[in-house]
Amino acid sequence: MTVINGIEIDCIDYKVNDIKYAIQNNDPIENKLHVLVVISNPCLYAIRYKLFNEFIRRLQDDEHIQLYVVEMIYKHQQFIVTSSSNPYHLQLKTKHPIWHKENMIQLGIRYLLPANWKAVAWIDADVEFENTTWALDTLKILNGSKDIVQLFSHCVDMAKDESTLNIFNSFGYSFSKNKAYTIKGLDYWHPGYAWAMTRKAYDKVGIYDKGVLGSGDSIIALSLINKVHINLNYQYHPDYKQSILDYQEKAKSLRLGYVPGVIRHYYHGTKANRKYVERWKILIDHQYSPFQHVTYDDVGILVPTKSFSKQFKKDILKYFKERKEDE
């Protein structure tokens, strides 16, 4: 035993890094990671297409991924980034703009992926990976070690000039490091940007897609750690709260992890214009019920029912316009 300044230096607090061991020792669950990227643009923001095209260019030469694109258009819009002749593209069209991201991911999985797929990722098209082995690392971690992973440990959130606005820890990283859950400050558990899961996990829980104003990432992440009640405003309609709690019941037993590495998040409008807090007032004002207000059409697209009021639709479109992503 060696003691210096009253501290016993041989008594170390060593924690096994199971993520590192999985990368070092596991074989990939399959040869390629199936990566879905979705885009809808009801307000035709130019920056969305620009960032999307840059994202595709960065990933198209990665030998460890198979990339798929799902594009949703509304009313009189035209398809801009997909082709009907490309077997890796899915083109969807519907009338009313609501938040379709998670619905599009699930339709991409249904219509584009091969029948024998084993791992799927869904990634926002406004990020860039600094880790050149992120896809291979993901395939290894998902081969018996984790059921679902966030594809980064840290994120550099950038301003328009690419200077640093903030640095986030990923939700999966924070959970894996046994940090205290917080939604503010330097230790904020960021639930977004990029995820992947195994086929077995997806078949069990799917992806929550009933959030017509977003927050799917947050609902999924909090469900994994049995804390989704944090996201439930007491004024929400009971049906909405119940649908989220039902998802948590399926998801809470999954093994959550992360993929080591940094991503960069590109600027597309101010955070203030996203109105992450104010937007939930729309759901409260209209007492949104996923059991009454939405259904699926013949293709599987989430669409409003007759109970979904015109004003509700207008308020959602107004929110999309107020994001002002090209500013």
What are these regions (language model features)?
Residues I123-A125:
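Catalytic metal- and UDP-sugar-binding loop of GT-A-like glycosyltransferases, i.e.
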Residues E128-N226, I244:
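Conserved catalytic core of nucleotide-sugar-dependent glycosyltransferases
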Residues E71-W117:
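Active-site-proximal specificity loops/subdomain of glycosyltransferases
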Residues V120:
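Short aromatic/hydrophobic "clamp" motif used to bind/position activated sugar donors
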Residues P42-L44, R58-Q60, V70-V81, V127:
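A conserved acidic beta->alpha catalytic loop
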Residues N31-V38, I56-L59, I65-V69, G108:
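Hydrophobic targeting segments
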Residues M1-L33, N41-F55, G211-E327:
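C-terminal catalytic/acceptor-binding lobe
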Residues V70, V149-H154, V259, Y266:
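Short glycine/serine/threonine-enriched helix-capping/active-site loop
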